[in-house]
C-alpha cells in the first residue's frame, strides 16, 4: 500500500483527461490521501471530471460550493452541480437537491419538488432521504399528510440505523401513529436511538423506565438515561433529573445537585 505512488499515477492519468482519475485525484487533494491536502486543487480536479459528466465529481463539486470548501460558498452553483448528479441517479445528490428545495437554498423553495427528489433517493434505499420523506409525510410538507406512509419511511430509515428515524418510529409506536400502539416496540426503538446518543430518545427512554412503560419500572435506569440526555442539553431531562435527585428516586438524594 503506497498512497503517494497511487496519487502520483492517478494525477498523471488525470492530466491526460481521464475523468475517473480526475475525480480520484480530486478526492486525494480533498482528504490529503497521498498528497498534501489542498481543497482548491480538489475543486480544480472535481470540476474537470464534473464537466466530463463524472457523477461523483459533480456531487462533490456541489458540496465544495455548498460548504465554501476550496472555493467561495455559492449555493446556486452548488445546486447546479447537485442537479446534474441527481439527474444521473446519484442518491446522495438527489437527497441533497431535495434538501435545497425544502429550505430554498440556491433555488426557490418548493416542497413538492423536495418530496420528488427525496423520493427518488429513498426508493434507491438512501437512508437519510427515507427519513426526510417520512418527515414530509408526517407534517404534510409538499405532500398530503399521511401518518401511515410516514411510519413506513421512518421504519425503512430506522432499520438502516438512522437515529432520528428510530426515535420517530418509537414515537409512532408510543402514540399509535400509523401503527398499533405497542409500548415494547416503542422502548426498543428509543433504545436504538438512545444508544447512538440521540438526546430526545434518551429522554423518552428515561421516561419509559420512570413510568414502567414497555419495561419494568426502574428509577436507576431512568436516572441513567435522563442524565445522558441532560448532559446533551435537553431541558426536560435536566428538570426531571433534578426532581429525581431532590426526591432520591434512582439516585442518592442530593438537593444541591
Which residues make up each language-model segment?
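Short hydrophobic transmembrane-like helices used for membrane targeting/insertion
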Residues: 8, 18-20, 25, 55, ...
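Hydrophobic face of amphipathic alpha-helices that form TPR/SEL1-like repeat modules
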Residues: 24-31, 35, 60-67, 96-103, ...
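Short helix-capping/linker turns of helical repeat alpha-solenoids
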Residues: 10, 15-18, 31-33, 38, ...
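Alpha-helical tetratricopeptide repeat
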Residues: 4, 8, 21, 59, ...
